[in-house]
Amino acid sequence: MLSPKRTKYRKQQRGRMKGKATRGNRINFGEYGLVALEPAWITARQIEASRRAMTRYVRRGGQIWIRIFPDKPVTQRAAETRMGSGKGNPEYWVCVVKPGRILFEMGGVAEPIAREAMRLAAQKLPIKVKFVTKADFEKPEPAQATASEVATSSV
């Protein structure tokens, strides 16, 4: 499972998930992607389960990129512990995901195969997601006016 090799501090505060993702919201490596539609903490176990589901379906065919990394420790108190006596110990790692963030990318396979693999991965995640292609992110070219259109518009 994914986790940082070392961190500056063992424990972090919970924080807030406001707004949309401003980074990691475009497809950079593959042809297809899975984009988050709502904010959530995604655990290292959920990322690993999604990766296994995609890899098992695609087999040797394509390549998969995991675009998120669990770098936030979540602490838990021991069972039947009285109140007070400080914060609990880190138990697992999560990735803070905002809407619009690309979670996984895939390339080297046909779109129906990628779509089904991403659907299987989406079932392992606690949020709503959407399948996107690289073409969805390309800006449409502004239409160039032809000479006949320019002549008629000046009349």
UniProtKB/Swiss-Prot annotation:
Q: Where is this region: Disordered?
A: 1-22
Specify the signal sequence span. Answer: none
Entry keywords, A to Z: Ribonucleoprotein, Ribosomal protein, RNA-binding, rRNA-binding, tRNA-binding
Assembly, in brief, is: Part of the 50S ribosomal subunit.
The record's Gene Ontology biological-process terms are: translation
Q: Which Pfam families does the entry link to?
A: Ribosomal_L16 (PF00252)
Q: Does the keyword RNA-binding apply?
A: yes
Which family does this protein fall into? Belongs to the universal ribosomal protein uL16 family.
Cross-referenced HAMAP family: Ribosomal_uL16
As for what it does, the entry says: Binds 23S rRNA and is also seen to make contacts with the A and possibly P site tRNAs.
Name of the protein this chain belongs to: Large ribosomal subunit protein uL16
What does the record give under GO molecular function? Answer: rRNA binding; structural constituent of ribosome; tRNA binding
Keyword check for Hydrolase, yes or no: no
Give the CC-aspect GO terms.
cytosolic large ribosomal subunit
